[in-house]
């Protein structure tokens, strides 16, 4: 049953008095993500209780999201101390293979004989989940998302690179039930773990994932369940980039950047931002200053700009007033010339009429003289 589990449920026996669902969820949740009830949202942990007294009977079932996590729980938690009692942890078996989720959790009378392969009657047969090419000493990767079976000579998993745990052995994976082919290294020692098994599951430097609560080994920089970064670790340092991205800058580099910025400002007299770009307002004022003569020192740039604007405005107003004065004098002179021309015309008409009358009188006098 250890190679490819069909479900993610494990059966736990010999629990001490006072055990509740939260204690089991905290303990078994350290190796994998527990499945949650869709209605209540709580981890799927079931304590068997007496029908009459409603007291816990000392056994329970725990369901994982990943069946391989359940397999790892059997490997790590079986025959371990839990609040003073040595508990038994076994894979759950379906009562009916076609019944879907209907699972019967079987209590084993002989401790771990049924799982580890005790001396049975008959020829026996190798576990159906065991690989035919497996040999004594082969070991399974402890990474619950990998569970690759590696040859005995490998020190790390050839699929995910996880280090081989101390005392890991795959002998139980080839164990048969009874005598016969497939009898593994643990076949004659029912209820016992390999001699080199680690005494504890996690060390003091192992860390719990802040997202899913999974406990990871100290060497991991990411959670092996949800890929969340280890607390205190990030991929690129401080987000100091212009777009909020990662940008690693040490103190020496910052000082060098400031020094170069000061040198650039002293060379061309312009202001730069922290990224080395010319500031916009100083860029505009520099262009305006190029088109105007220099102003007396000691005034700020904006004061120079405002004075220049006021000066130009006053000059324009003077020009407009001067133009208006010229137009006024021109109109006045034109009106005067017109009045003079009219007066001269009147004088000419008067002189012409006077001369004509005088000639007429002279003609009359001559005519009367000749008649007499």
Swiss-Prot record:
Listed Gly residues bias regions: 168-190, 234-244
Annotated Basic and acidic residues bias: 245-264, 308-372
InterPro entries in alphabetical order: Nucleotide-bd_a/b_plait_sf (IPR012677), RBD_domain_sf (IPR035979), RRM_dom (IPR000504), Znf_RanBP2 (IPR001876), Znf_RanBP2_sf (IPR036443)
Domain RRM positions: 8-94
Keywords from the named record: Activator, Coiled coil, Metal-binding, Nucleus, Repeat, RNA-binding, Transcription, Transcription regulation, Zinc, Zinc-finger
One Pfam family of this chain: RRM_1
GO molecular function: RNA binding; zinc ion binding
Superkingdom of origin organism: Eukaryota
Entry GO terms, CC: nucleus
Spans annotated as Disordered: 111-136, 166-199, 229-272, 285-372
CDD domains (UniProt xref): RRM_SARFH
Subunit structure of this chain's protein: Component of the TFIID complex. TFIID is composed of TATA binding protein (TBP) and a number of TBP-associated factors (TAFs) whose MWs range from 14-217 kDa. Interacts with TAF4, TAF4B and TAF12B.
Protein family membership: Belongs to the TAF15 family.
Name of the molecule in the record: Transcription initiation factor TFIID subunit 15
Record gene name: TAF15
């Amino acid at each position: 049953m250890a190679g490819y589990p069909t479900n993610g449920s494990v059966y736990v026996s010999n629990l001490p008095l006072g055990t509740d669902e939260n204690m089991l969820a905290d303990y078994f949740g350290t190796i994998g993500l527990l499945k949650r009830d869709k209605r209540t949202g709580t981890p799927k942990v079931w304590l068997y209780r007496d029908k009459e007294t409603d007291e816990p009977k000392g056994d329970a079932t725990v369901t994982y999201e990943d069946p391989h996590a359940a397999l790892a729980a059997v490997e790590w938690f079986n025959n371990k101390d839990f609040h003073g009692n040595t508990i038994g942890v076994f894979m759950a078996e379906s009562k009916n293979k076609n019944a879907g989720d209907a699972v019967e959790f079987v209590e084993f009378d002989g401790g771990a004989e049924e799982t580890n392969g005790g001396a049975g009657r008959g020829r026996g047969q190798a576990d159906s989940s065991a690989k035919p090419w497996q040999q004594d000493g082969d070991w399974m990767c402890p990474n619950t998302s990998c569970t690759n079976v590696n040859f005995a000579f490998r020190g790390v998993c050839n699929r995910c690179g996880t280090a081989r745990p101390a005392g890991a052995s795959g002998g139980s994976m080839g164990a048969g039930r009874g005598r016969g082919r497939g009898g593994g290294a643990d076949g004659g020692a029912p209820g016992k773990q390999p001699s080199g098994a680690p005494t504890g599951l996690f060390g003091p430097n192992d860390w719990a994932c802040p997202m899913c609560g999974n406990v990871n080994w100290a060497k991991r920089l990411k959670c092996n369940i949800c890929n969340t970064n280890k607390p205190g670790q990030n991929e690129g340092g401080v987000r100091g980039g212009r777009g909020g991205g990662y940008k690693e800058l040490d103190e020496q580099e910052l000082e060098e950047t400031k020094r170069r910025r000061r040198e650039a400002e002293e060379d061309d007299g312009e202001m730069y931002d922290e990224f080395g770009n010319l500031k916009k307002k100083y860029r505009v004022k520099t262009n305006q200053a190029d088109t105007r003569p220099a102003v007396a020192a000691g005034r700020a740039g904006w004061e120079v700009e405002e004075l220049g604007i006021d000066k130009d405005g006053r000059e324009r107003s003077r020009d407009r007033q001067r133009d208006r004065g010229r137009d006024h004098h021109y109109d006045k002179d034109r009106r005067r010339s017109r009045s003079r021309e009219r007066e001269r015309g009147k004088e000419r008409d008067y002189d012409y009429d006077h001369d004509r009358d005088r000639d007429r009188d002279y003609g009359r006098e001559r005519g009367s003289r000749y008649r007499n």
